[in-house]
């Protein structure tokens, strides 16, 4: 009996940590996670792309600097659905003298906002085609594609802690004490 219970618990946790869509390439892995297991009509949902690189490798920011290319994402959406993003976090400086580039070492998390129409089908697919560049001493193009079906089963979405971490890493706080009003005149 204990053995059966152990198997059930192991199966639950293996499904609990499974990503919706994973794309493995030579020096990196892309995971695609939805905000929740359910996407409702007339709502905004967060879809998250996580790119993890092998140790010592990096990928590029939207403005890569002197060299490199940012990741590109092509979405296949049902009729009436719209997607915006990614919401880029602040990059790290990646010097490669005499060049200066901007990007992310080891991992980057990129949220997208999916807007749904007032009426959505009971079942639908979201397709993703991704291209990104990973570099160490040389750069290697990475790519992959796939689809996820909604509603889907046996897949866990992001936890509240993971969502909080994504928002913390991508949305910068502004210190309003550093700003000063120098004129109350209207600007034209």
Features from the language model and the residues they span:
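Extracellular/lumen-exposed scaffold segments
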Residues: 18-188
């Amino acid at each position: 009996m204990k053995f059966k219970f152990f198997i059930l618990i192991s199966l639950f946790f293996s499904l609990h940590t499974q990503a919706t869509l994973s794309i493995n390439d030579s020096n990196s892995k892309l995971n695609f996670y939805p905000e929740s297991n359910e996407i409702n009509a007339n709502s905004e949902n967060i879809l998250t792309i996580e790119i993890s690189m092998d140790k010592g490798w990096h990928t590029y920011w939207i403005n890569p600097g002197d060299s490199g290319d940012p990741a590109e994402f092509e979405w296949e959406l049902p009729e009436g659905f719209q997607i915006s993003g990614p919401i880029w976090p602040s990059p790290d400086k990646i010097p490669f003298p005499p060049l200066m580039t901007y990007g992310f070492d080891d991992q980057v998390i990129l949220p997208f906002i999916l807007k749904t129409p007032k009426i959505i089908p009971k079942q639908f697919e979201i397709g993703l085609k991704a291209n990104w560049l990973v570099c160490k001493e040389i750069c290697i193009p990475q790519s992959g594609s796939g689809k996820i079906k909604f509603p889907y089963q046996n897949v866990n979405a992001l936890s509240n802690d993971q969502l909080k971490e994504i928002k913390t890493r991508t949305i910068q706080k502004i210190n309003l004490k550093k700003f000063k009003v120098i004129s109350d005149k209207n600007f034209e």
